[in-house]
Structures are given as structure tokens and as C-alpha cells.
Amino acid sequence: RWLGWQKFCWISCLFSSISSGLDPGEQAKVTTALDTAQFAINAINEEYIAQAKAIEEALKVSTQARSADLLRRQTELAKFGSKVGKALKAVQAASAIASFVFTFFMPSELDVITSLINERFNEVNAKLDRIDEKLDEMEKSIKADTAFNVFLSAWIKWEYKVRNGAKKLSDIRKAMGTKTQRIDQVKLAEEYVKYYETNNLDGNVLSLYRMAALPESITQRNIFDRFIAQFGCDITKLSELMILVQNIMTSAGQQKLTYYYFKGDQSRANSSFKDIQMYFFKIRQGFDDRVWHCRRNSLDYAKRDANKILKNMRGSSRESIVRAIFNELKVKYPWYTWAVAAVKSDRPRIRGLELRGSTYFRLEDRSDAKKVKGYFVVYEDTRSSASCSDITQAKTLLVFKKCDGCNSDYIYAADNILSKKRCGESTLERLVDFKQQCPVCHRWPYSITCYCANRVKQDSQNMGLYCISSQHH
């Protein structure tokens, strides 16, 4: 409330100083323009701070993080990518400042601009510049990935034109806040109009919209489709791309509306904002559709990525291959938790330990036809839970002999996927049906054949058996 009172006093002081030069209608227009800009800027500032934090967390993702934490971060970032309202508010804020310039500085009969008006104008303008700086910080963080940066440079060729236009507009606004003569304000506005036209910036908004929302004529892909084709269905990176597209679109939209206001064409500025609004919603729809596509087809993409790693790492140690596949799938597709293991082709013949369930897939390295190397990949919904005590109820159970020379590091499993490595030596033993496996021993318990049960126990504990189970529903 104190801030609101301070703001009221500021505006009151402002217009008591200039009331002799402005009629009530002009005063109302100036008040509306500045207040609209102030309101829009304040509304989006906190959102951009939260978005920057989400990006920072996403970029610090570690393979040591829990799957649930990875999923939370990715979901939060995707939500920010889908929120175009804040971008539209940023466009409106710049539009309101341009409207203020047109309404007061440009057609005003006052030759002298009071220092108090300039001070208020600079205050609002500085807040808008700080938001632009925050957008630049987010962009630099995202584009620290070299491959990401190369992709953007190839597909957003006019990005630098937009960035240069934003710098020019910022410089013009700052200069306006230092001038006390109306004619100087007019000259600055004319300078920007000429720059905008000379550099052909008017087509940037439409070009960006077409690239992001509409399929390209030959390949029938937009920028999100091309990104998925090159980087796979990584929703974290896809969300970062959407945020970059939003930021560029926001800047281009601010420049476009400012151009029309500085030209004195308020009607065209209003219609252009409606177009920009539609463009943002269409781009968001394209992004949301691709996120849904990635979620729906995540297992297919995971299989493709795992096979690609296996192909690229032929000749590497099996332990390093298992670790690479596990880390890739864990970070890229966190709505599933994963387990990966290197195995021998033969399985133990113990009743009760038969392969069951379907939430897994098998990879094979056939580079050596005489010695096929097998890998199991098991997955589970991250939101479900499992513990060692649940193993008898497991929906998917894989029990296999470890590969020759393997040690415990040849199995990597997420926190809520069970493995013998984590659940203790008696895990598999609890699943064996000893009456079926050793029927003679159970009919004649004092017979010498009773060594069977001990042998089965030893097999399940000491022969290098591993199990991966999933509670997938």
C-alpha cells in the first residue's frame, strides 16, 4: 500500500508541475500510458525471475539426481515454455512506452519537457531494460551448449537483425529520457523509424511465426520438428528452444509496435498486436503438440537412443556402455525411471525366476557374430513406487547370469527400480518355488536329495544372478 501511495503522489506531483501545459485529456492519456507500462512490467518481472531459476536448475541437471527431481524440473521448464502470456505482457509494456512517447512527446504543443516527466519516463524505461537484460541472461545460459547454438544460427538467420534492432530501440529510449526539447524527441523517433525501414525489420515477426508454427514446404517440418530430428525428444532442450523463440518474438514484436506508434499510426499498432497475439498462441500450440508427441513416443525414442549409443560405443567396455545408456535415458526421459544391465545370453533354469512382464526391451551388439552381447533395459513410471519388499508382486522380472568378467557396476538402476545389488542376497531366493524346483526333497525330507534346496539357494545367491524388477502399472 505504501508503494501504491508513493506512486499516487508521484503522479500527482507530476501533473501539478505540468498541468499548465497539458489539458485534462492529455493528462489522462499520459497517465494511462505510463501506468499501463508500469503495471505490465511489474506483472512479468517475477515470472521472468522464476523462469531464469528454472533454466538454471535445468542446466545443472546431474545423473546423480533422483528421477522424480529430474521430472519436476523438466515439467516446470515445459510449463514456462508454454506460458506465452508473459511475453505478450512484455510486448504490451514496450507498446505502452511507445504510446506514451507518441501521446506526449510527439504531438504535444509543449516545446520543453520537464525534468520530472523525463525522470518518470526513465524509471519505467529502466525497468523494461532490466527485463530485456534478464532475457539476454537466459539466452546466454541456454546457448552455452555449442551444438544448440549452431542449430539456432542455422535456422534463425535473422536473429541478429532482431537483436540489433532491440539494441537500437533501447538506445533511442534512453536518449529520449535525456532530452528536454520536444523537437529532439521527434528527431529520435524519426531516427528509429528510418532504421526500422532501412533494415527491413517489419518482416521479422511474420518470418519467425512461419518458421516456428508452420511446416516448411519441402520437408513439412517446423523448427520444433527439425530440432527433434537432430537432438531427439529431449523435452528440456525443446523447452529451452521455445523460450528462445519466445524471447526473439517478444523483441521483434516490441520493435514492430514501437515503429507504428512512432509513425503515429495507432490503428496499425493495435491491429499488429492482435496479429502478434495470434502468432504466439499458434507457436505455443506447435510446442505443446511436440511435447505431447515426445511423451507419447518416449519409449520408441529411448530405444533409438540406446541403440545409437550401443552402435557408437562398439569396442568400449560393457560397463561404460551400460553407464552411458543409463545416464542418457535417465536425464532425457525422466517421466520413466530406468535400469540397464549387461547380461549373458543364457538364463538360469530355476522355477519361479522365469522372465515375466513387458516393461523392458533388449539390445544386442552383433558386431561379433560369434559372440552376441546382450543388454536389458527396464523402465517404470517415475510416479510409481517400489521397495525390496514388493519384489514378489513385481510386474516385470528379469533374472539372468551376469556377463563374463562383470562386476556389480554392470547394472545401473534408478532409485525405485529393484535390483539384487541393492536389495540384498535373499531377494531372488524369496521368489523360488522350492517345492516345484526340488520335489523329491519335499516328499522325503530326510533323503540325501535334500541338498537340492541348498544348491538352488547357492545358485540364486552366488552364480552372479541379477534381477531387475518394475512395479509398472
Swiss-Prot record:
InterPro entries: SE-CTX-like. GO terms for cellular component: extracellular region. It is found in: Secreted. Residues 1-21 form the signal peptide. Keywords: Coiled coil, Secreted, Signal. Its main location: secreted. Residues 40-60, 116-147 form a coiled coil. The keyword Secreted applies. Component of the acid-insoluble and acid-soluble organic matrix of the aragonitic skeleton (at protein level). PANTHER family: PROTEIN RAPUNZEL, RICIN B-TYPE LECTIN DOMAIN-CONTAINING PROTEIN. This is Cephalotoxin-like protein. It comes from Acropora millepora (Staghorn coral).
